[in-house]
Amino acid sequence: MPACHGKRLFRLAGRRCDGVDLMKMPSPNSKLISGAAIMLALWAIFLLSALVISWALDIDSRLSLSGDGARMLKAEAVACSGAEVALHPAVTPGSRNLSGQLDNGASYEARLSGEGGRLNLNWLVAGEDPDRLEILRRFLEVKEIDLHERDTMVDSLLDWVEPNTGLHHLNAPSESDDYHPPHTLLTRIEELKKIAGWSEFTSTPGWEDEFTLNSSGPVDLAWASRDVLLALPGLTPEIVDRFLQARRGPDGIDGTEDDTQIRGIDDAHLLLRLNEEQFKRLNGLISFKDPVLRVVSVGTAGKAKRTVQMVFRRIGAVPQLITWKEF
């Protein structure tokens, strides 16, 4: 048996050689293995922590989205409530019931106005009545659109809505593969964006506010804006401003409690201060208290806001809904 530092080497397990326990002698790679194990453990802890943090952030995001969604639904519901209040036949534009707050903190603010105060485009172009078309031309002039553009816009609109008879209006572009009018009346105000010559006008914010397709037709003197009134024959800025001041009352706002009570077309005639000849020019072009109304109701819940817009016809006790829009 070979010697171990001058002593005999024992092969039995657990025996010592030169005072050293062979079973407890460290392996050359033991420190490397221990270090790797620690690194793996730390890496596992890091990954687990990252997963927990990601999960927590996801839950927080979902809760936040859920809260925002709940507030949006609440705002939409309360906006609908305001619109439904406006449908009641006893509610007038200046009614205090058009604004309110619920127990849950949500609130609504609704505004009721006459649809007839806007220009009904289909009515203006129907049959190419020169007096009606002149209202549209003057309105575009009030909006500071030059003569050449006005001619293009009006002729293109006429081509767009009239039946396809092969005739073509002088200032409208010819039909092509890229431009093909449907030759039917407008169904949505937004169609104007597709009509030649109207792109610049319809890119202006609020351009659609003074147009409609849903009124009875003639301009409603109870609700027409300054620009719409100026488009009527014989109405000068002085006449219009004087009329609006009287119609709106001290606060200068339509649809409030201090508005002048105008009972009919004869009262409107007196407020306009037109002679009989001047007023006769408006015959067939104006009305008073068109039965078609518009309500715009804004619901608020926290920072969330939703708007409901309805156009309806108020005849009798049951309103007839024409359009509904949410945004």
Model-predicted segments: where are they?
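N-terminal leader/signal peptides at the extreme start of proteins
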Residues: 1-34
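Compositionally biased linear targeting/interaction segments
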Residues: 24-29, 33-327
